Amino acid sequence: MKLISILLIATLVMAACRSTKKIQKAIVTKDSVVVVNSPVPTHIDTVQMVNDLLRNCKQISYGTFSAKIKVDYFNSKGKQPDFVANVRLRKDSLIWISLSNDLGIEGIRVLITKDSIKVMDKLANTIQIRPLSSIQEISQIPFSLSDLQELLVGNPIFFNRDSITYYSKTANGFSLLSMGAVFKNLVTINNSFQVEKSKVDDLDGKRNRTADITYYEYETKTGVLFSTYREMNLSQQTKLDVQLKFKDYKFNEEMSFPFTVPKKFKRIQ
């Protein structure tokens, strides 16, 4: 379960941008002004700029999604064994994950539905079934099946469209800050309307929880603008660095979700 938590928490900070209807406050710092001789933008001008910007950042529309993700991570003890996560999902229905080592030997298979998570350990011959709320308890992050699916695909989460409190333009792109109920999220978008960075901070200072993610290697092989390599720096008491490399990703194709538990497997708590 701890390994599953690492993968899910790592994907948690994959946030992009979505449309907005209002801005509570617009701040333009001196360092972020590009055209020095231009008039200072009014509040209405800034609202229009942000609306135009977010209209160009489109969400990924999908029915199904699958990908092979190579996961490398480092904690306080140094580099940990890397693994490969084969992920498949059907929108609003389920998430299927198969974890294997670099030799292709599968160790764990996971099935997540709207109300439960099942973890089958093929090496220990055990099956563990828990309510989906257990993921929230492990990660201390409130999310649903839909949230997890959006995160894996790369669509926005914890980026409140009605709570943008900061907007600035630089020579290289734009920055937007959203204040949500749990997190604040500073997103940097380049001039090609690709999300380059996302910095997520917990609003509860006692948890001292933060995450930085950088997006690389965008491509449109499947007709969808998709970041195939991401680096994350997660911090909450201890530091965790994660690298995700997406391969063989597919959208809207037929796929199966095999999850048959052998009779000899023992159910554990």
Regions found by a protein language model. Give the residues of each.
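Post-signal peptide N-terminal segment of secreted/secretory-pathway proteins
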Residues: 67-109, 115-116
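Positively charged n-region of N-terminal signal peptides that target proteins for export
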Residues: 1-6
